Amino acid sequence: MEFPDPPWLNQFRASTNSFLSQYEPLTLLLSPLFALLLAQILQSFFLVIHERGLKATIISWCLVLINTLTLRSRSYIGGNEHEGHFSLINEACSMFAHTNPLHLSVFPSVVRFEAEVVAMTAALLGSKEKTSGGQICGNMTSGGTESILLAVKSSRDYMKAKKGITKPEMIIPVSAHSAYDKAAQYFKIKLWRVPVDKEFRADVKAVNRHINKNTIMIVGSAPGFPHGIIDPIEDLGDLASSYGICLHVDLCLGGFVLPFARKLGYPVPPFDFTVQGVTSISVDVHKYGLAPKGTSVVLYRNHEIRKHQFVAVTEWTGGLYVSPTIAGSRPGGLIAGAWAAMISLGFEGYLENTREIMEASKSIQKGIQDIPELFIIGRPDMSIIAFGSDVVDIFEVNDVMSSKGWHLNALQRPNSVHICVTLQHVPVVQIFLKDLRDSVQTVKENPGPVNGGFAPIYGAAGKMPDRGMVQDLLIEFMDSSC
């Protein structure tokens, strides 16, 4: 949830508005001139800063002020600050902030940290089981997208070496993460999207129909980002094995929840390297692993596949060069922070976190089901709960929830929103459900766009038949935002 503005700030705003209202005509006349003058003063100020720099104490004060005024929401990685979790990983990041694992011999400690993070993550996903083959290996990356990009690139090159495929194709369900679209564009791979079934799981028969001589890989999610539903990984594994192609499982959300949910007795279908046919897995440590942002892991069933991830250059005048991931230099501080997070929490810590998260998720799911105007999308397997409505505009409900401080993700096909339950939600489940009930009632009684809301945009975008136009609008939006 968002935190309310401090009382002094609200009082200042009220006093300012009251004062200006007395001189409204003059204010309207002079405000453009004042704005121009202020812009010139700020421009001159920043030019001086860029040339001369600022003292550390002033920078620290500025950061605190910016954090107070603008960063009003808590972070996604809701660790337990009372036990010093954030302080610990911040200290680890700071201690190794200037290290770079690209230079293996210069920073051996960071290289060791990475190896241990990979090994601990792999152990959660079946590396110690005989059915895994005993060769699970991998690397840390900057996030789930890079992990997926590397898995796709490695699969493409592995299948080229193994089968001679030069016009690669991959098959994904429509619920798969958009990182696969990015990979297809980057690596010149033809992308086939297949529908999901009535339970919003990947349609295995549809996947089978699209497999041909150029297919390099198929994809499953555990769970999928939109609806929190696990694809039939075993069935996809059977397909991959029978055709001799790769199967990547996206565990970016589930990697640090599903192994523990299974341990707690929740009905979790198979999803890891114990499933024959799975050749690679992506899992984010910076989500439910509670590591600093910018830490993920990509894993492979064996070294033969992973070798196709690497880039080696022999003819550069700068010397021999080899790099394991897309980035050359990598921040060793983040690797150290991830290591510290995992070592600190341990199996028992993650188990207890999962217990609380899953209990909160089930309570929220039941609470949503009890709201007659709403319905749950499919049967959520984890802590992501998507819901829609045939009675009210769900995007208008989302806008009202946003005004109350809740930030939910808007989805399409069907129109819906989802909540991704974290530790931050555990103590406020009933507050969330009350706000949701009130928001639904507000929209039901007063339908129509919320001032400043995004419902009209989402609604219009979903109805536009020309998806190329929507794509152009997204690109223009991004170009103007960064």
Regions found by a protein language model. Give the residues of each.
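Non-catalytic terminal extensions of PLP-dependent enzymes
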Residues: 1-111, 115-119, 123, 128-131, ...
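Conserved beta-loop-alpha segment that forms the PLP phosphate-binding cup at the N-terminus of a helix
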Residues: 114, 118, 134-165, 179-183
